[in-house]
Each structure stands twice: as C-alpha cells, then as structure tokens.
C-alpha cells in the first residue's frame, strides 16, 4: 500500500511538472539604453529566484532602428547588441522576454510628441489639433493611413529580431481620439470598428506573418457602461465592441489597480475565449485582491499575473512591495493547488 501511495504521488508530481508554469510576469519600462539593460541584467538572477519567469520590456522608440534612424528616441538608445546580450541573460535564467511597442495611442507624453508623429506629422489622427498636446491625454496615430503600418511594422520587426522574441506586447491602452471631431479620417466613424481594424492589422503582421504571440492591454475592450471600472480601466467611447471582432488567440492583459470585491472583466474575456494575464500595480492590497480573485474564479485560460512598475525607482525594484507580497501569495496558492491534487488521487488507508 505504501508503494502504491508513493507511486500515485510521484505520478501526480510528474503531471504537475509537465503542466505549463503560470506566468509570473514583470512589466518594465525606462530601461532605454544598453547600460540600463546591462544594469537590469544584474538583477535578473534575483528576480528569477523570486519567481519571475516572464519580463515584458517596454521598448517603444528607444531602439537604434536601422530601417528608420529618424525614429530613434534619445541619443543613446538600445542597440541590437545590447538587446541580444540582455535576451541571452533572460534565456539562461529561463525568463521569457517579451518586448513591447506602444501602438496607436501613447504617441506623446505631456508636451513631448514621440518620433513617429514628429517625423511624420501627417500620421497623426488629429493633425494640427491640440497644440503642445494640451487638452488630450496622448497623441494617437491614424489607423486608416496604410503608410503608418508599413513603417511601424519595420520597427516591430527590428525589435523582435534583436530580442529573439517569440511574443510581442503591442500596448493599445487608453485610446480616446478615434472618431474625434478633430480627426479628419475617423470623424463620425464607429470607434469599435476602427479599433478592431487596428488590432487586426497588427495581428496579421505579428501572428500570421512573424508567427509570434500577441499581447495587448484590455481596457479598451471592456464596456465601461456594463462594467463599473470608469473611463480609464474600461471604455466609454465605443471601442469595447471590438472585443467580438478580433482573434481569440490574442493574450489580453486587463489592468486593475484598486481593491474590489470582484474583477468581472477577467471572466468576461475568458468566457469569450481569450487567454488572460491580469495586471496590478502599486497597492499591495489591490494586488492581493486581484491575484486572489483571478486564481479562485478563473480556469486554464488564466495565464498568471503581471506586476507593473510605473514610477518604481530602479534601485527599489527587487523590494517593490506588491511584487514581493504578490509572488508570496502566488506561491501559497500554487502550493495549495498541488496539495489538493495529491489529496484527490491518493488512496485512503
């Protein structure tokens, strides 16, 4: 009997090992030079030991593009050699590295407009409007201009190749200008259809042509009239209908940064067939609540959890409280799940 119990337990352990590991993802930005990536590389062993197995690195225009050098941001952007060096470190530590390029929105921040729209102002969805970026959150590119996609895909290709990436995060959060009265090309048009068209354009290039997995933020796909998340975590401008017009193998990353009793967006995406990677931020209690709800209510399409680090100083990353406490909770939940599986198959004496 003891031998039987041991054999069954060993079988359970073997099955657990063979299952895909839950994603313990860390989103990082402002590592915009080779030196910054090299410094981050020194933290990778500790992050791996803590349990991080996915890094989503927001690159954007901080890369030494060869196809379009005019679109480099800063005087010392990440080089292909620097990217390759960092990717090699990640691979050695079994960390999946996923680069990100903010698409459609986030083409400016405060008074600074980023290289695409400064070099090609005709790509702006609201050309000539909002001087000094006053009166808007961020500038957006025109998804109906085919020249935009031709150039952007060249940038994405360079980043994918440099980081040897098998997945790519395209951003696409906080979009507010589609269908704007100030937008000659999209004025009066259905923002949900426009948004879906943009998502599908990128999907065709990344997934169908480059054969990489595609991730995107989920806020513009959540109906803010149905789910009470407000106009930032959800959409009140019509883009949410795009959720039924895009491929279901896109990985959706809904971000929720406040404590709630439930997070129905996660279940909504899963019920529609998407895989989901929820993201939290700086509030420890909110992080615990999001992880707890996700792990309790979601099934196999829940990939894990993403920790975002907006505003976190680089020298404080390893001790970032939501990261430390969130990983601790995830370990506790995973341990309980393994124990529960063993109890279900272990014969009683």
Where are these regions (language model features)?
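Aromatic-lined carbohydrate-binding/catalytic grooves of carbohydrate-active enzymes
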Residues: 48-82
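Active-site-adjacent "subsite" loops/lids of carbohydrate-active enzymes
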Residues: 104-158, 278
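Hydrophobic faces of well-ordered beta-strands that scaffold small-molecule active sites
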Residues: 24-28, 55-57, 97-99, 168-170, ...
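Active-site neighborhood of glycoside hydrolase catalytic domains
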Residues: 146-273, 285
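The substrate-binding groove and active-site-proximal loops of carbohydrate-active enzymes
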Residues: 24-35, 68-80, 133-150, 184-194, ...
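Substrate-binding cleft of secreted/luminal carbohydrate-active enzymes
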Residues: 277-349
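Short, acidic/polar
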Residues: 33-48, 153-155, 260-266, 287-293
């Amino acid at each position: 009997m003891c031998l039987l119990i041991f054999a069954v337990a060993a079988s359970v352990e073997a099955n657990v090992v063979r299952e895909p590991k839950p994603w313990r993802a860390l989103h990082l930005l402002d590592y915009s030079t080779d030196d910054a990536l090299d410094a981050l590389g020194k933290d990778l062993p500790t992050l791996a030991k803590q349990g991080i197995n996915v890094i989503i690195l927001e690159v954007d225009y901080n890369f030494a593009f060869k196809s379009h050098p005019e679109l480099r941001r800063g005087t010392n952007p990440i080089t292909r050699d620097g990217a390759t060096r960092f990717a090699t470190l990640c691979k050695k530590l079994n960390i999946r590295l996923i680069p990100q390029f903010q698409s459609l929105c986030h083409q400016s921040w405060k008074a600074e407009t980023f290289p695409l729209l400064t070099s090609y102002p005709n790509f702006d969805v609201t050309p000539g409007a909002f001087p000094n970026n006053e009166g808007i959150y961020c500038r957006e590119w025109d998804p109906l201009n085919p020249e935009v996609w031709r150039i952007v895909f060249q940038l994405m290709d360079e980043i994918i190749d440099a980081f040897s990436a098998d997945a790519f995060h395209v951003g696409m959060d906080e979009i507010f200008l589609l269908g704007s009265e100030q937008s000659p090309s999209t004025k009066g048009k259905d923002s949900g259809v426009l948004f879906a068209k943009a998502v599908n354009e990128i999907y065709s290039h990344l997934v169908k042509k480059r054969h990489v997995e595609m991730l995107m933020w989920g806020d513009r796909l959540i109906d803010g009239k149905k789910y009470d998340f407000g106009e930032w975590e959800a959409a009140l401008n019509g883009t949410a209908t795009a959720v039924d017009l895009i491929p279901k193998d896109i990985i959706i990353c809904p971000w929720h940064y406040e404590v709630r009793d439930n997070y129905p967006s996660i279940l909504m995406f899963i019920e529609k067939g998407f895989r989901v990677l929820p993201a939290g931020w700086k509030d420890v209690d909110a992080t615990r609540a999001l992880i707890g709800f996700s792990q309790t209510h979601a099934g196999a399409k829940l990939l894990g959890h993403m920790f975002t680090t907006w505003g976190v100083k680089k020298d404080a990353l390893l001790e970032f409280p939501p990261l430390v406490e969130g990983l601790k909770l995830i370990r506790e939940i995973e341990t309980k799940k393994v124990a529960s599986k063993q109890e279900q198959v272990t014969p009683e004496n």
